Amino acid sequence: MINNFIIISEARSGTTSLTGSINSGLRTPENRFWSNGIESQPVLGEPFTLLFKRIDDPDPSVARNRPLYNYVHGENGFFTRLPERTKKFVEPKRSPKFKIEDRHDTPQYVFDDVIDLSYTENNGIKEIVRGESYCEKLLSATSRCDYRYIHLRRHNHLAMAISFWMSKQHNVWNFPANWPQNKKFRQNIINKFKDFDLEPLDITELERHVARLDKRKEIFEDIKNENWITIEFKDLYSSGHELSYNTYLKIVDFINLDIHSETFNKCQGSHTWVDMFFGNGKRVTQNCVYDKIPNLKEILSHFDYTKEQLSERI
């Protein structure tokens, strides 16, 4: 039986690919869609920010392309099954631009109610570190349940900050896995990414971002126990397949998940499965991308970095 789990990390540390690999594996033709036609979410991605989001777009294609949003806010969705106290708090604050990290007044019961419902409906949750107060409330809620924690850790903070602010411009946060049936969709996203003309990155914003990452790098170290596993970015996203594969096995063994079954790996085989989600083809910020940053030289000089250091997978 799979242990319920939390995937948690700073943004740009690989949480989306890890979540995607588990979601895709756990979905089957029998459980892919709920009775209301909404796609199931074995791993619920960033529920607290999503809870407060509002997307008011009349184009039906927009709704169809947002399965996670539909899971939460669609007809008979996750939001409708939350206790009234949380719905009453959340509904007036929903907005396209809501950021939960800016709302320190979010009460503990919102975190508790979301976790209680998700624990019964989802195998896991993916969350992003959003500050000390946010993490305290999240962990206070999850500690009441039998979760295992997968902490993805990345040390190249400048690379993370640059990747984040580039993605804010072109809005490509992750390449889809290299499924044969996904080829056209995947290529469209890659082309959008390749053809985008980046504007200069704000060095002051990068400074603030790196400072936040530096400050929070030890945020979980004092509370880790046997229910935590720390996964280094350089191992899961290694340039060598064997290290990536063995690291992925370490994760799935920790949560009692069998990736060798054809039901999970969709007859691709476990090695191919890992390559599809963590191979070089999944990297958004590859070395050549840095050359597209108009003020790259100024950034490197300001942070006393070399391009080789920026490209290190650590």
Regions found by a protein language model. Name each.
Residues 25-26, 225, 293:
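Acidic-histidine catalytic/liganding microenvironments
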Residues 67, 106-113, 137, 160, ...:
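Exposed alpha-helical structural elements
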Residues 1-110, 174-198, 202, 273, ...:
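PAPS-dependent sulfotransferase catalytic core
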Residues 105, 109-137:
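Glycine-rich phosphate-binding loop used to anchor ATP phosphates in small-molecule kinases
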Residues 2, 119-122, 147:
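Short, high-confidence coil segments that cap the C-terminus of an alpha-helix
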